[in-house]
């Protein structure tokens, strides 16, 4: 569990120029905490090969610490959780990634370490076909795997339809933002975002006041991929942000799936190519996903045990003990 000091130093580390996502995580992992990265910064070149003097000099930054203190105060005043790599509530799947954020801001009720987590992404120009997939797929998934958490990016198109479809079947859903938690972008999705706070939440690595600039969306996509067991591309043109998310998921060695479409449909070309190039598995139903991920194994095993017991309804107490031992 992090202290307030560790949270402030973790935020400050994100404000140091020239460090980057991979560098920041490497520093924290190598020193054991963001606090020690700053406290023992002059020792970094000796303790962590590859760290240069420019980074050491940049870490001597009262401005970064002041900005971090302001942001932490903003988070506390607005009941925003601040998770560092040391926190149990930090997404464990994301922590495994080399470029995981050293700090995350979260508002909501979802468990970011839920047993099963998927993300659903796709084009901002969702067709009726894509919208129907979001609804029907999550309806079916809710019946087969009711504990799944649905992640997306709150953007136009497939993203917002995935969130709304999850809400409609009472699945928790988390939106990963490309800006701070002082705003909702696009503003048209504010009502859905508010609903998500009661049944999911909003997550970001960005400080308040950060604009939703183009490069932030790529950073956002790595969180979407890294927090999930599986990435599902619903619809995509030949080029698009969801294909970047799929590539990132592949680099993390996470499962990726795509729904196929007609070969001449503009917003199925990306999905069809992912499947053709073996970058994604073909997905036709929620049952396909549950089977591919092995999420149905415990239930199947349990069913076999129940069948075995029903074959021997009149066992003695001693015989029942033997059966119980064999089941273990």
Language-model features: where?
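Glycine-biased, small-residue-rich flexible motifs in mid-sequence functional cores and linkers
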Residues: 2-4, 84-328
